[in-house]
Amino acid sequence: FVWSNQLGISTSSGADGSFELELPAASSPNGGGIADGDYIIYFFISNYELSTVEVTFASGEILNDNRIIKIDGELRKKVNLRRMVQINTSVQPSIFPKNFEEDVKVIIKATPDRSDIFFYLKGLEIPRQPTVYSGLLIKDISSGELVLSFNPDTAGTIKRVIDKPYREFDINFEIINDSLGSIIPPGTYEALPYIIIESNDNVPAHILNALESGYNEFSEEYFKYPIYRTGGKFTITE
């Protein structure tokens, strides 16, 4: 998530990290343009440390900087973000038929680079029994749409510390309903467990406020939460 609080503009980077920020066209501040001065651009991924770049505008144009930015607005160097926790999701089995009647297991493996990482997950806490984790969203790879969500009505939000060297959480779900019909048609999907990340780093409120509304809710809006994770893909066959 790329954001400038002073300019009030934002965008999301592509899969390769590239992005474009569309600046106001007018050169006059009264006309919606940019006043002379220094502006900070923030780069936010929830499981990475916040990174910033400062650029300078004069007469509505970016000033050329031999270290940071070219006059045409292209950054001279890649923006590097330092990882706080690595997140990998695996689905077992990763390929199965649409009439598969056993549980599908989703394993979240969190490997922290720091000792102050916390996850907010969904699940059921039952006295003297292991926590049952839920909060699973299934996304269709081809359309990018939500096709299935798994989270019992009685599930709540659970906070967990992510200890070194790593911590794992399991979610089990079924693709067969009570009438033995497949809930999901054949295709390729991605399992996205609901995770909101917290650390001792204070993310400025204006960044969180600038995110799409509902990013922290258990719904399709969660897809807009800036988080980098690997794995999670699985295929359902005929």
Spell out what each predicted region is.
Residues E20-I40, S179-P186:
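Short Pro-Gly-centered beta-turn/loop motif in secreted/extracellular proteins
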Residues G32-N64, K70:
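A short, solvent-exposed loop/turn motif at the edges and junctions
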Residues S51-V53, L75, P226-G232:
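Extracellular and select intracellular beta-sandwich modules with Ser/Thr-enriched
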